[in-house]
């Protein structure tokens, strides 16, 4: 890690700590996720790294490399200077329909690419969508800790994600299509951008997860009267929020929906993105064997010492599991901020 100097902390979670760093040589800024060596370097971490490494798209945070310190495994990635989309909504209250569409188009573009690479995200939410620092912000999907590759793994069965965003079939705890479940989560994200609240939470009891789950299973939601939403947008939401995953709208169908196509920037078209990916294909990345060797070494506990004053020994922060009795749901983020 001598190559990077730490600028500041930029986040923490059940994974550990994230820091903003600068490449000493190029002066380029990166975000680094530090995960304590030893037991925390599990299959989820390995899957996150391997899946993230394979993705190269303008709407996905770019993976750079993994580095080993005496105490931590460091995942170096593109820095999104605009922060979380979640924070932007908290500040704005809610978005206009045009602004919501602008971000939704980018979200669907990134998710569509993930699915084309046979990777479903399984934890799509506002906190996992970052923005770059440009005036017309580019959305960047991040955090592939729950992602599943249908090339490397069987169909998902586990109930993971954040309760407000989870699809009914995931809660049923049967085998499900992760791509179709991602569509539901995209719908929740769109709704929150438009309304400034979660579609399936009781406003009087937002922390009552059991009630939220009941509402999800019965697809009980409404767009409040005070929010002006076009009929085309309402139609799209009604096609996303369908309990039967086989009848739910697919990503390709969303990309052909009239509401989605309105004001679609040229860089969001499939033709344009294909040309970008072809140009990007020769960009060198850290080798697979090197990454696997680093992950394997990181499974051994660290030496417990501080690292050269630059990267201090870092603690980690565990989030409480949600108590939903017989339903196992993981809480991986904040829920609501006075929406």
Curated annotation (Swiss-Prot):
Any single Gene Ontology cellular-component annotation: cytoplasm
GO molecular function: ATP binding; protein serine kinase activity; protein serine/threonine kinase activity
Residue runs in coiled coils: none
Gene Ontology biological process terms, A to Z: abscisic acid-activated signaling pathway; seed germination
Catalytic residues as annotated in Swiss-Prot or TrEMBL: 123 (proton acceptor)
InterPro entries hit by this protein: Kinase-like_dom_sf, Prot_kinase_dom, Protein_kinase_ATP_BS, Ser/Thr_kinase_AS
Keywords: Abscisic acid signaling pathway, ATP-binding, Kinase, Nucleotide-binding, Phosphoprotein, Serine/threonine-protein kinase, Stress response, Transferase
Annotated Protein kinase domain residues: 4-260
Region (C-terminal): 253-339
Keyword Protease in annotation: no
Catalytic activity: L-seryl-[protein] + ATP = O-phospho-L-seryl-[protein] + ADP + H(+); L-threonyl-[protein] + ATP = O-phospho-L-threonyl-[protein] + ADP + H(+)
Pfam families: Pkinase
Amino acids binding ATP: 10-18, 33
Modification(s) after translation: Phosphorylated.
EC primary class: transferase
EC number(s) on file: 2.7.11.1
Domain commentary: The C-terminal region is necessary for the kinase activation in response to hyperosmotic stress.
Role noted for this protein: May play a role in signal transduction of hyperosmotic response. Can phosphorylate BZIP46 in vitro.
Family in the record: Belongs to the protein kinase superfamily. Ser/Thr protein kinase family.
Protein name: Serine/threonine-protein kinase SAPK2
Native species: Oryza sativa subsp. indica
Phylogenetic placement of the source organism: Eukaryota, Viridiplantae, Streptophyta, Embryophyta, Tracheophyta
UniProt gene name: SAPK2
